[in-house]
Amino acid sequence: MALRFPRFSQGLAQDPTTRRIWFGIATAHDFESHDDITEERLYQNIFASHFGQLAIIFLWTSGNLFHVAWQGNFETWVQDPLHVRPIAHAIWDPHFGQPAVEAFTRGGALGPVNIAYSGVYQWWYTIGLRTNEDLYTGALFLLFLSAISLIGGWLHLQPKWKPRVSWFKNAESRLNHHLSGLFGVSSLAWTGHLVHVAIPASRGEYVRWNNFLNVLPHPQGLGPLFTGQWNLYAQNPDSSSHLFGTSQGSGTAILTLLGGFHPQTQSLWLTDIAHHHLAIAILFLIAGHMYRTNFGIGHSIKDLLEAHIPPGGRLGRGHKGLYDTINNSIHFQLGLALASLGVITSLVAQHMYSLPAYAFIAQDFTTQAALYTHHQYIAGFIMTGAFAHGAIFFIRDYNPEQNEDNVLARMLDHKEAIISHLSWASLFLGFHTLGLYVHNDVMLAFGTPEKQILIEPIFAQWIQSAHGKTSYGFDVLLSSTNGPAFNAGRSIWLPGWLNAINENSNSLFLTIGPGDFLVHHAIALGLHTTTLILVKGALDARGSKLMPDKKDFGYSFPCDGPGRGGTCDISAWDAFYLAVFWMLNTIGWVTFYWHWKHITLWQGNVSQFNESSTYLMGWLRDYLWLNSSQLINGYNPFGMNSLSVWAWMFLFGHLVWATGFMFLISWRGYWQELIETLAWAHERTPLANLIRWKDKPVALSIVQARLVGLAHFSVGYIFTYAAFLIASTSGKFG
């Protein structure tokens, strides 16, 4: 008999129904559950797949460079970044009539094109690329790296080159290499690129392979480094009248601590960025030599964990047993990695707009909005994934004997307290925030807006003042003009910071009021509720009050009727599933808040946000409805415009989102009935009945239907908001 899909599970391959296909797809990447899997093969498969992942990433970035070089207008954009619209790629569509061709021919192009809202133009410009040839060179290099990665993945699956399990479990060596190699050396290399290529380019000097060995990045070369006069590298920075990309007003400094923004580009000083990366490189190069390997120097992580006795014995046996628990569980390690990466991705979203690193990106409002929203959604999915794998760790890898009375076991012992406190915080935030919003709504509806409950966020304003924002009138720390911190700040460190924080043209420490106070607490409600669901799902993964014996049921068992006491919605997967809705909900509020506040800031009418954001009707009417007018107007009696594609996507996003409910609000019997009816009709229809299938069609399982529903809900939700965000922002600001 020929091998049927899935080859990794012979039991599933013999299933006579369509379940074979769906379960096969669902478990294709769950290597642990495959036939004949060994620990060694498991680690080797995952290791090899990392090379494939890298190959895809390099291929994708290569494609970005290639398409912009081929179909974009990079060289024209470089001449005038503020007024030329950057082109992502051409559009070839045989359906386009003349009005469509005219609507999408922009940015000086000869035919229809897409505008780039990804910020790649600003990024490439900042790091010193100037010509299409530079872009092609980068694309070819990344294509080469992609090929090398694929070869590496293939190579490490060959018997001679397969690493052993002991190699994968050598935590100290891996940590040393990742800290000093991945972070240290790459940061040092990036500092080198900034100093040798990007900073000269920002001063009008074109450094390439043919001349980089004879162009000194600093007039005194390496002299100051070897004589210990490092401060010379910070002297004579670019002046405030510097024109980026030219020598006009430029200096010679390469490593500075200026603070604030370049007045023309509104982005961080390149010399500050280089300094930052050099500092990071040194820190991580040192950190990468801290752990004991073959050389007998440095710390053993296991010794560190075992030696730590918590004060007063309040944490039981502390960290004993944790080293082996973590080192033998790839789910625990993945959970930690995803949690860290999720937080970092959200921080990227926050810092890309408040401290823009790329020249002129702060003046490209649509790109700013798109990048913020993109990174927040990515962060949400990564963070929920961290808890999913935390739950799988408890089910598959957690050994109570190994972890007796240590911090992990004690988390499980008092999980009721953790869950109930989170529940209490969520309820408090939800009822109070909604109560304030609804009260204010009613006051507006009754024509007495002066009776709203408006709370000034005085603690947050005090924190902003401590960082140097003077408009609130708090006389504290950096906003206290006669304090030592203020005086030191003028000269020693970051002299440009105080100018930047008090300038109202950027997004640093935006002025906040009662509307911000309310939406902040709405977001806090979303964060706490999402966390509650995720934490409960992970801590109850092995067993809960209703069902103490979940271990053998696995991660995603379905509803199993009243026979076993009713198992509906109590698998770890069900918690993850519910949490994703709350995560999307929360990020919706976050992005609504960010976008509305910035639209009013960019348009110069901040009072609209301040006055309308204190009640729900204000959000619905003055943010959502008012800004969707561009989308509703994509097609009208006068033909079409360049927003019509977003208008279509807005509708299509709603359709995908609504389709999700078809899967979410249904039951298995209905699906089976529907499929039987369709199969019956197919078999009795001439011509159609020539096509037969061997697998008997069966309904999706409850878990599968929920997954399909969740996928449609998520994709539709994000599609809809993406279209709204890009159309409403680009429609206003071009």
UniProtKB/Swiss-Prot annotation:
UniProt keywords, alphabetically: 4Fe-4S, Chlorophyll, Chloroplast, Chromophore, Electron transport, Iron, Iron-sulfur, Magnesium, Membrane, Metal-binding, Oxidoreductase, Photosynthesis, Photosystem I, Plastid, Thylakoid, Transmembrane, Transmembrane helix, Transport
Residues at which chlorophyll a B3 binds: M662, Y670
Catalysis performed (reactions): reduced [plastocyanin] + hnu + oxidized [2Fe-2S]-[ferredoxin] = oxidized [plastocyanin] + reduced [2Fe-2S]-[ferredoxin]
Residues reported to bind phylloquinone: W671
Binding note for cofactor: P700 is a chlorophyll a/chlorophyll a' dimer, A0 is one or more chlorophyll a, A1 is one or both phylloquinones and FX is a shared 4Fe-4S iron-sulfur center.
Binding, [4Fe-4S] cluster: C559, C568
Assigned EC number: 1.97.1.12
Compartments where found: Plastid, Chloroplast thylakoid membrane
GO cellular component: chloroplast thylakoid membrane; photosystem I
Pfam families on file: PsaA_PsaB (PF00223)
Protein name: Photosystem I P700 chlorophyll a apoprotein A2
Organism per entry: Aethionema grandiflorum (Persian stone-cress)
Gene: psaB
